[in-house]
Amino acid sequence: MFTILKKIEDLTVTIVGLGVIGAAFAQSFKEIGIKTVYGIDIDEETLKKAEEKSIINKGFIETKEPLEKSDFVVITLYPNLMKSFFVNNIDNFKENAIITDVVGIKEKIIGDINPIMEKIRIQSGKNIDFIFGHPMAGREKRGIDFADSKVFKNANYIIIKDEKNKRENLELLSEIVKLMGFKKVSFLTAQEHDEIIAFTSQLTHAIAVSLVNSDSEKYDTNRFIGDSYRDLTRIAKINEDLWAELFMGNKKNLLEMIQQFEKELDIIKDALNNNDLGTLKEKFIMSTRRREKID
């Protein structure tokens, strides 16, 4: 463990994109002892804030200098910006650099990025290892002002399995995120990731959005809500740009999960129409047992 910790401490790290997640990564990296953390962002004010908060050593708008120095790069860009970022920086990555991302969809992103990574290897001969990852943590608000590394504590982290990745690099990433506070690290294929995320993340956001938007506003709803409504709708305060991309990028899986959810809702609706108390109780008992397994 001492060797791993020493290695992590001496890494030069760059965060690409200092929004709410990128800045939280930077903050967490400093907290676990990484000495040199750079930040890349298109917004000068964001870079200035990051430097003032001492979560990065230096901020950059231009990418070449920090990428050429970095052993470890975390890209926190929106999905539609990933491909162009790699095309524009194909020659800038350091030899033996480890790169990871935080994007919530994988099959599409990997399909975009892997050909570019292969081009880097062929053109430059550089040995670069891209390990696709997904921290299962976030906040409803956006921007560096709302970044907080505490969001990672006891959260789950998914690493995408790929035979091209070096085992020692996979172990290093896994160790880093555990030090950051992530409780469980899972290894999935891209397909497995997108299927389960369609259910546990994207469907839940779709339900929250639909619940809030289904309000007829006949009454002043805010005067009559309780914890159940607050808990169910917390994630309805949503980043429309990011989540529109995530939904569309995983459309097939999400549509399947919506249909599955609709079937369950129809069972409850039919039970009500048929005065079927037994079916209602069965569904309530089933959900209680399943939820208790999560706790």
Please report, for each region that a protein language model flagged, where it lies by residue.
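Internal alpha-helical scaffold of NAD(P)-dependent oxidoreductase catalytic cores
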Residues: V151-R234
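Hydrophobic Val/Ile/Leu positions in short beta-strands of Rossmann-like dinucleotide-binding domains
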Residues: V13-I15, I75, I159
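NAD(P)+-binding Rossmann beta1-loop-alpha1 motif at the extreme N-terminus of oxidoreductases
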Residues: F2-E68
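Residues at the starts of beta-strands that form the adenosine-phosphate
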Residues: T12, K35-T36, D129, N156, ...
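Rossmann-like NAD(P)-binding element
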Residues: K64-F93, A97-T100
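Interdomain hinge/lid region at the active-site interface
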Residues: K218-S287
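Short, well-ordered coil/turn residues at beta-beta hairpins
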Residues: T76-L77, V102, I160, Q202
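Rossmann-like NAD(P)(H) cofactor-binding subdomain of soluble oxidoreductases
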Residues: N88-D145
